[in-house]
């Protein structure tokens, strides 16, 4: 018997939905149609983004100055784009274009980079610009994990009082851990120990060493190391010995009122307590401070240590390596904590010296290569850079491979930056969020459009002169593929 199909089609035919058929016979009407690059972005209006069949494509400075967000799965091109954007700003430093909204020479780049390899890439692009155009502003690579690194940035203000420094470190610890992890009692103990640690000198160490031969009582260290000892980080006997030696100094004849207050505070830790009672009191804060104790070199400034104020005033560039470097380890928790301290210090420095910078055409560009690290530890600073930083000349650039790990409120802020560049997204929910932002002008974007992007291809939502333009797709360019062509494309119409 003849086999009769269940639908009236030839055996070699197959069914198509109307939209699928339209996409085959008229590709311009398919789901990825209408993704043409706005004509204004063909002009050199900012950093080079990529190219398509019609030529180069640029990111507009005027809109990027209000915030650039870059998201995408690992290996898709996020970091390469950030390096290219930084290279454009190095070019502006070396040979200012004079174009409206361009950053020019008066622009300090502060890069939060979790990988040493990434930091080396920023150095290479800086060197490329220096060789082809002339030297940009100085660049410093700071390996936070490496005590031997000659370039250092102070984590606390040198002009702060001992108590203020103790409170700033305690606040950073509180932000870096989960809400409630640093309770009121732990916070009080941390401030006391860190405050008292400032008063340790060679006489105090000698007196403590006479009581207990502890390695921490030899050489020179910072208030963080001594604060850790006072929280029994080297054992209860060492803590008792250091506290006793400090007490003798702080209440000696002629001691000022502040010294006596520190001595009084120490009594809350080393008064009438048994070792067991004291351990219950200091165990939790000690464990928190231990994250910083092995980075003592970052809290012991010398004549070569730079402050963020100096970096900003000189419009210098600094890459902060917030990960392992040169054989020195750094855990994720330590990276978050140090990043929180650095972001807080940068925000404080900007507030102090950069008021009115936007009107003076002076800028600071924080580049955060992996937002998920800072988002957990310093969300307030990140929000401030975008929401309040504009009048201070702040031009934030945030990127992440893991937008799902960024808290929802901050992720929404990220995806609504004036310029959004999205490489392939692996998570379905994130792809949907990005697609919704790409289509805010009414154009149709689906999660699949974002999830199926090829490596080094990006979907871009931008605007020109604050007027929204339809999102588009483009192949991004890696500056190292052809440095000469990359530099030439960036420098069209540029004058020295």
Where are these regions (language model features)?
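P-loop NTPase motor domains
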Residues: 48-51, 61-64, 73-74, 81-394, ...
